[in-house]
Amino acid sequence: MSIKEELMEIIEAIKYTSEKPEEIVHGKGPRIIVKESRIIDVQGDEGIILEGKEEDGKIKAKIIVKKGYKFKYPIHMCFGITEENISQIIDVEIILEEDSSISLMSHCSFPKGKGIKHIMNGIIKIGKNAKFSYNEFHYHGMDGDILVKPTVKVEIDEGGIYISNFTLTKGRIGTLDIEQEIIAKKDAIIDITTRTYAIKEDVVKVNEVVKLNGENAKCIIKSRGAAMDNSKISLKLKIEGNAPYSKGHIDCAEIVKGNAEVESIPIVVVRDDKARITHEAAIGSVDKKQLETLMAKGLDEDEATEIIVKGMIGDL
């Protein structure tokens, strides 16, 4: 298969995660495009270094944003699997030097979703007063025979900002197992949001730990999701307030329907008497009044439930 044909397959795959896949693949902006276990395209730009190589059955990628460079347009990483029974293993290192800023959009699309493993190990280093905005969009097809396991370690220097949004709300999930550890220095800001919509026998596991080690560091962790049918969602979210005036909040809102199960374990740890960490969780069925209002407009119960759930997780 030619490179052109492979890029066309990638375009078809990421239609599920982007409204303009052609612009991502053929545009002028920085990007890394991976299909199965092969790097199809790497494009850098002034102020940013993008490197990628295939080694020992893995994809190894590195992104370095040079000091002072602030990118107004997003950088794209595309990971596509268009075949069945494929393992895709990726090691990624992302470094933002002092006073730099980027928005990175990661498109992970596996439309056939059968016998697939997508394993990602990430290291992120955010320099002093740098800002990293990361948006990750997934589509896993309709079979559910898939394992996705991202493991990420983040270090944030003084005044650094880390914004992370993970979205998997269309199709099946299969098994999703997220592990993330974040260490924050003075005046760092962290904002993490996870959105999932689990159906049938899908399984979601999220384990996130944030250590506010610097004075005045701040963090919010948000989870928005729904567990339907026989699916299971397990959330273990932890914030440590280890320094004076550090502040953190955990906010979980999950809907359960059918024989599904949601477990939410917020953990707050305070090791300084000037720190403050809080949490709240709301888990339950769809609001009956909202349901009745929509059904009165002609929707059946399943249609009304889907609208309420997707409105809650921000997918409308």
From Swiss-Prot:
GO terms for biological process: iron-sulfur cluster assembly. It comes from the Archaea. Belongs to the iron-sulfur cluster assembly SufBD family. This is Iron-sulfur cluster assembly SufBD family protein MJ0034. It comes from Methanocaldococcus jannaschii (strain ATCC 43067 / DSM 2661 / JAL-1 / JCM 10045 / NBRC 100440) (Methanococcus jannaschii).
